[in-house]
């Protein structure tokens, strides 16, 4: 970059972020399983990233609803945002819980990736592309469901912990 080309700096993880992605492309695997969008809603520093494979054909309805313009619990964004905002208010107390949950899903994603690739290959060979993509879709939906549930549990815990004040 030329001097002066960048005049403003911004952290990647900011509270007003709607979503973040990390794109993983592995050309030695079939496209359907080799391309993964690790997708996180809300603040990238506080939200889990779920794997959305190139072969994923559908997402939960909550992921199809924009929650950026108003509070709405039919949008997945708010299930993450509530816990994240409450954690931010009392970061010193909430940080350990939130980071433990983030690390859990990060490890789960890394540890299960090879298993997903192998199962995809088995299904592709034995039942065809449609069954293999259905597996990826179900796996993605399961990951999303697990993170939504965990963030809802954190929201309830934080509200209980802070019920007498922040």
Regions found by a protein language model. Name each.
Residues 1-166:
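C-terminus-biased signal that marks the final domain/tail of proteins
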């Amino acid at each position: 970059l030329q001097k002066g080309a960048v005049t403003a700096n911004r952290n990647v993880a900011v509270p007003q972020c709607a979503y973040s992605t990390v794109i993983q492309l592995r050309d030695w695997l079939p496209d359907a399983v080799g391309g993964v969008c690790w997708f996180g809603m809300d603040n990238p520093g506080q939200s889990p990233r779920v794997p959305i494979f190139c072969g994923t054909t559908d997402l939960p309805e909550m992921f199809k609803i924009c929650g950026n313009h108003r509070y709405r619990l039919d949008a997945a964004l708010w299930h993450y945002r509530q816990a994240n905002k409450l954690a931010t208010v009392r970061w010193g107390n909430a940080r350990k819980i939130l980071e433990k949950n983030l690390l859990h899903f990060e490890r789960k994603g890394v540890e299960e990736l090879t298993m997903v690739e192998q199962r995809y290959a088995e299904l592709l060979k034995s039942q065809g592309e449609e069954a293999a993509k259905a597996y990826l879709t179900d796996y993605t939906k399961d990951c999303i469901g697990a993170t939504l549930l965990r963030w809802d549990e954190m929201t309830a815990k934080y509200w209980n912990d802070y019920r007498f004040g922040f």
